[in-house]
Amino acid sequence: TNARFAWQHQSGGEIVDGQTLPCADYASLADAIGAYLARLGRPAPLDCAIAIANPITGDQVRMTNHHWAFSISALKAQCGFDRLRVLNDFTALALALPHLPADELRQVGGGTPVAGTPIALIGPGTGLGVSGLVPDGRGGWIALEGEGGHATLGGRTDRETAVLRQIDVQYGHASGERAVSGQGLVDVHEAL
């Protein structure tokens, strides 16, 4: 698990100075932020946004795939940010979708894309990230936050059902995340 940092001098400006720091090298997120800033020789920015692979349901955040835990308000004070926004990583990715150039988009499935309709985002990693956007009726978008990777999977064929049954026995639940993620792909391969 890594923490990826970058700097943006102004809203809408170029994103520069990207660096990846192994989470295991730092006792806390604040320590990793401090190390990144020290490498750049910069003070803390006034505004900071953090996208994290974790549900954000309040001030307290405990990472699901690493030992870091923190209070958003305490992190803001400790790092000296004027504003701090912490959101789920796939919610952040979904919010970026309308800003992608057309050559970065890929049609999945049949049919023709229709502008201004809901957009889905799904991606495997340590878990299965899921998010999406729905039109807000005013030309903007509303991000859908959730942990869709935990939805139960059902097989369509006898073979799929047998694979999912084995995953269910192993974990107590056959979810999307248990089948479509780094470890999930290994488990599906072994079940086959």
Where are these regions (language model features)?
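Glycine-rich phosphate-binding loop signature in dinucleotide/nucleotide-binding domains
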Residues: 40-44, 113-116
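A short alpha->loop->secondary-structure connector
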Residues: 101-104, 137-150
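Short beta-strand-loop/turn "lid" adjacent to the catalytic site in phosphate-handling enzymes
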Residues: 41-86, 91-104, 121
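Active-site rim beta-loop-alpha module in soluble metabolic enzymes
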Residues: 150-192
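Short glycine-rich, Thr/Ser-proximal phosphate-binding strand/loop in the N-terminal lobe
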Residues: 1-35, 144-150
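A gly/proline- and charged-residue-enriched helix-loop-helix capping module
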Residues: 95-121, 158-163
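Gly/Thr-rich phosphate-binding beta-strand-loop-beta motif of the actin/hexokinase/Hsp70
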Residues: 1-14, 119-137, 185
